[in-house]
A protein has these predicted regions:
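Short glycine-/small-residue-rich Rossmann-like dinucleotide-binding loops
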Residues: 10, 72, 112-113, 157, ...
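General small-molecule cofactor/ligand-binding pocket signal
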Residues: 34-36, 85-89, 138, 183, ...
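Fold-core signature of tandem repeat domains
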Residues: 5, 67-68, 97, 166, ...
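Small/aliphatic-rich secondary-structure junction motif
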Residues: 1-54, 150-204, 226-228, 233-237
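A short acidic, glycine-rich active-site loop
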Residues: 53-66, 202-213
Length: 297
């Protein structure tokens, strides 16, 4: 069997919603589901190994195992044909989930869990895994409906991470039997104008020329993929404005939004760009963040 879909649980309602989404993703891929709960002593944040002392029915470790068992049952109810395994892994949530993602085809987490502070829009696990995961990371947002309908929205910006995101978006759309909405937003103040092939020709400077360049960027980013995925219809949108606003707006009609972890405008050293962070906080549907192969290694 191919690499499983990974999902993290913490006993929250958001965690169980993520399990249902992850189970559907596993079923579409024809693979298994690995459900993980990271366990540590909550007062001192010290990892707690199983103890030979005390009743087997008691203690926090047993509660953690029951939590995982309930998540496995929930996965079985959501997708009866998916083989789901549960594991209580000793350690803090952030490094445990990042390490577990090495062997996963996809990692799924809720947008917030029991550890989120009141008022926060996004939990630390979702942000950390999106930035450090070794596989694509799907953060469950919106109503958390596993069967939410609509196109897969792909954010296109011409970056290496964006290219990996487009590939993932096409594969995901094919699995779901839906189409792609490829969105590229640009600003005339940030547009990159390529030099003319003819040295004697003038540089593009008018709004029409700039728009044509952005249309070309989108076409080049999609080139070849429509041939590989002939059954996936593609709708293209080139919008003048900010990518964050454009993609958040597109998320209202989407089943999933897919973006690269960092785009062309990302600062060196940043693992998660402003667009992906904005979507993780404000999108109206689940968000998949894809890092380039170079960034994952």
């Amino acid at each position: 069997m191919s690499a499983p879909v990974l999902v993290g649980v913490d006993g929250s309602a958001e965690g169980l919603a993520a399990v249902a989404v992850a189970a559907r993703e596993a079923r579409m891929r024809g693979t298994g589901l690995r459900i993980v709960h990271a366990f540590f002593w909550p007062m001192m944040r010290v990892p707690l190994e199983p103890s030979s002392m005390g009743p087997p029915e008691g203690g926090l470790r047993n509660q953690a195992e029951q939590l995982v068992a309930e998540a496995v049952r929930h996965a079985g109810e959501a997708e009866p044909g998916v083989a789901a395994e549960g594991a209580v892994v000793t350690g803090d949530t952030l490094p445990v989930m990042a390490e577990e993602s090495r062997g996963a085809a996809l990692a799924v987490v809720g947008s917030r869990g029991l550890g989120a502070f009141a008022g926060l829009l996004l939990g630390s696990t979702a942000v950390h895994l999106a930035a450090h995961g070794h596989c694509p990371v799907l953060v469950v947002r919106g109503a958390g409906d596993p069967a939410r309908e609509g196109p897969v929205v792909a954010g296109v910006d011409g970056s290496a991470a964006g290219d990996a995101a487009i590939e993932f978006a096409f594969a995901e759309a094919a699995l779901r039997g839906t189409g792609i909405l490829a969105v590229h937003a640009w600003s005339p103040w940030k547009a990159e104008v390529p030099p003319p092939q003819d040295p004697a020709a003038p540089y593009a400077s008018g709004a029409g020329d700039l728009a044509a360049n952005e249309e070309r960027l989108l076409a080049e980013a999609l080139a070849g993929r429509q041939e590989r995925y002939p059954d996936v219809p593609v709708d293209r949108r080139v919008l003048r404005g900010g990518p964050r606003e454009a993609l958040i707006e597109a998320s209202r009609e989407a089943a999933l939004v897919v973006v690269g972890a960092r785009g062309r405008g990302g600062f060196t050293g940043m693992l998660l760009g402003s667009v992906s962070q904005a979507l993780l906080h404000h999108a109206d549907c689940p968000v998949a963040v894809v890092r380039s192969q170079t960034a994952r290694s």
